[in-house]
């Protein structure tokens, strides 16, 4: 698969900068004597200390390319080929996995805009949510204690793609009208990720020994997954349109999916399940358009007067950062404008924020009615909706790549 991080830096819902990650797996078959006439290949991933590449049967590498303009036809700059650390099999295979993994943080030369870093590898899952209960008809105590649920992802690992990129490499350098008789560089960017696979797969009925011999893949890269704002495809987009959303581009969101934001079903479902929490009544839901499609005025809305509403994670790159110990995990609605939906920090509780925004918290935020709505439109808008799971910003590392060491597979 081809994994891509896209940046829109002028508000037209089209990528201006893309970072592409293309992966390759290599076999290093380890064969040992076992009493027969010849050595025999072992079935395990490693034979001894897995921090020594000679003891590991497979390795994975990836190439990073920066594309300016259209993701397929734009100007391409290869940034290098790097190795990915082997997953944390267990404490017998790795005596010091944190130290081993740190050796795979790689520098990136981004030309005149500066230098960055990249790390691709296994990390502890940072997302916290009571997932099973959310999808069991929101089988929660939505007005109960914020830490009263179970984080079902607490013992899970993920493969993470982490980048540290200078702001100068991401923002548009053009001078634009910033309002109030000011001109300058628009500091707001929008970001989303995609995964693409080759359009055709031919399965080999008689694969040879080796690796990746079971199929031949070819044709154009075809997008099969997309993520901008968290939980949009999971709890906003209707079931029949989930594949369509995954294959779509942000510039087409209004044409394809506007009714899911204008007339969302989640608040109606919450009201049906919990009658004491009436759904907002302002239709179309301009407050959700502001939160999910355009950005919040004065916080993370692009300066482009012809802004194209689209699902992406928007960030004002000039917002001062807040140290972990002082962060409010409710982000903007908690008074911390450096948090979600102005970007997304690892410790931000995007589930609680999304629930509260869906139920109309922005109607009580004092923003202009044309940007959101008024308090009378959302009678339950100030209710502290929660899935009962929290995660502190101080639970993460203070240095890149910030996400914690993965859980050992042998635990």
Regions found by a protein language model. Give the residues of each.
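Surface-exposed extracytoplasmic segments
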Residues: 1-411
């Amino acid at each position: 698969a081809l994994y891509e991080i896209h940046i829109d830096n002028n508000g037209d819902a089209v990528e201006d900068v893309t970072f592409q990650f293309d992966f390759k797996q290599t076999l290093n078959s380890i064969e040992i004597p076992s009493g027969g006439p010849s050595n025999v290949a072992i079935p395990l991933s490693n034979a001894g200390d897995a921090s020594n590449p000679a003891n590991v049967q497979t390795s994975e590498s990836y190439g990073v390319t920066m594309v300016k303009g259209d993701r397929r036809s734009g100007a391409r700059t290869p940034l290098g080929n790097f190795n990915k650390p082997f997953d944390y099999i267990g404490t017998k295979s790795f005596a010091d996995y944190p130290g081993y993994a740190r050796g795979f943080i790689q520098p990136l030369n981004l030309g005149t805009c500066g230098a960055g870093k990249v790390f691709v590898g296994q990390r502890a899952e940072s997302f916290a949510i009571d997932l099973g209960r959310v999808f069991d008809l929101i089988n929660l105590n939505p007005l109960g204690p914020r830490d009263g649920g179970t984080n079902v992802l607490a013992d899970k690992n993920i493969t993470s793609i982490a980048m540290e990129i200078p702001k100068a490499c991401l923002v548009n350098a053009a001078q634009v009208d910033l309002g109030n008789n000011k001109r300058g560089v628009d500091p707001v960017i929008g970001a989303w990720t995609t995964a693409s696979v080759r359009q055709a797969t031919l399965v080999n009925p008689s694969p040879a020994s080796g690796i990746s011999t079971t199929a031949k893949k070819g044709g154009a890269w075809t997008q099969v997954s997309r993520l901008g704002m968290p939980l949009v495809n999971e709890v906003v987009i209707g079931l029949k349109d989930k594949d369509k959303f995954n294959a779509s581009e942000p510039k087409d969101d209004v044409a394809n999916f506007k009714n899911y934001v204008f007339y969302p079903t989640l608040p109606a479902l919450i009201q049906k399940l919990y009658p004491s929490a009436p759904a907002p009544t302002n239709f179309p839901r301009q407050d959700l358009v502001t939160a999910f499609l355009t950005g919040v005025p004065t916080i993370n809305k692009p300066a482009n007067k012809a802004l194209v509403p689209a699902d992406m994670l928007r960030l004002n790159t000039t917002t001062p950062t807040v140290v972990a110990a002082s962060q409010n995990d409710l982000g903007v609605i908690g008074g911390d404008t450096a948090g979600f939906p102005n970007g997304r920090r690892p410790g931000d509780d995007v589930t609680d924020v999304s629930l509260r925004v869906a139920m109309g918290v922005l109607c009580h935020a004092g923003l202009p009615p044309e940007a959101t709505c008024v308090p009378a439109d959302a009678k339950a808008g100030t209710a502290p909706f929660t899935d009962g799971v929290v995660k502190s910003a101080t639970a993460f590392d203070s240095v890149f790549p910030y996400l914690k060491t993965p859980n050992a597979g042998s635990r």
